[in-house]
Amino acid sequence: MTISETWMGRIDVMKPWLGEEEAQALAEVIASGWVAQGPKVREFENAFAATQHAGFAVATSSCTSALHLALVVAGVQAGDDVVVPSFSFIATANAAAYVGARPVFADVDLHTGCVTAATIKAALTPATRAVIAVDQGGVPVDLEPIRALCDPLGIMVVEDAACAIGSRYRGQPVGSNAELAAWSFHPRKILTTGEGGMLTTARQDFGDRARRLREHAMSVSAADRHASLLAPSEEYLEIGFNYRMTDLQAAVGIVQLGRLEAAVRRRREIATTYASAFAGVEGLRLVGDPEYGMGNFQSCWLEVGPTFPLGREGLMEHLASDGISARRGIMAAHRQPAYAGADTGAAELGVTEWLSDHTLILPLYHELALHDQVRVIDSVLRAAGQP
């Protein structure tokens, strides 16, 4: 423990915003006796679909499982290629591998960290069946040009909106322009259910099949089966998965969804404070809103350029010495042992590698007090050589 942690307390990079409302919602589900997937999951799905302007929503055990289901219902299979950003959590690429497809890595835009139509085009192959476009760190991806490229070619575009609940794209909720979108409710996200995810889709056939597949492809849902006195017999229509969410998780999600606007507003306030403090500091760039949308600041990531006195690693060490937790930016999946040396396409990934080497995540969460924001700012400015 550093001296700063001892005297002033540690500042974590994130904390979930949970309270008595979530505790009460959990208590009510426990008292009901129905804790597995059931009526609360359906309520959460309906509320989430309405919030995101989606036709159908299917709750899952994680965003990774939602991505897997998205590719399955889209018909992606062994022998196909799926274009994905390397600049993303490794689950994005893994989802393609789960269906036997080949992940083909695309580069990203320097300013947003997101794939573009141009970077995707550079990675397309004759075997490309799908593209996964990520809203990196909550920054919305520019989806319209990507779909304009892919739709005429019969390439399915899946939006990995893991970080983007509450973000906006051209005035609409992120994900509302996608045929398939996957969401995460991990504790690092703005809306959390502990663990969990959601698949949203504009197509009923996709939604119906994903709903079956998430519980072993049963012809009758477990909730309907257990609710019936007649105990209807079920059939298993294909090989499915156990990707269910519990009513305990969904009850928390319903409360969290009601706080979404307040959560995004608060994060943007803190990000604005950081941006104002770091404006004009040589070698620093806070990743902000693109011209076509509004981010939720699920993560507050800072690009540390070569003119910054300490570099990225030095800045992280300096922050740690002041009792402040920071994290390296997004990984480059093509550098990980799981994919290093594998045939993952021939696209140049220079921007991906630059951003992976030169970005870090600063503390940002709902209950980050003003005096702690000032501590973070003061530490960064001192590292920059400013008084």
Q: What does each of the following model-derived ranges do?
A:
Residues 1-34, 39, 235-237, 363:
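N-terminal "arm"/small-domain region of PLP-dependent enzymes with the aminotransferase-like
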Residues 72-161, 168:
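PLP-dependent aminotransferase-like
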Residues 176-220:
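Active-site PLP attachment segment
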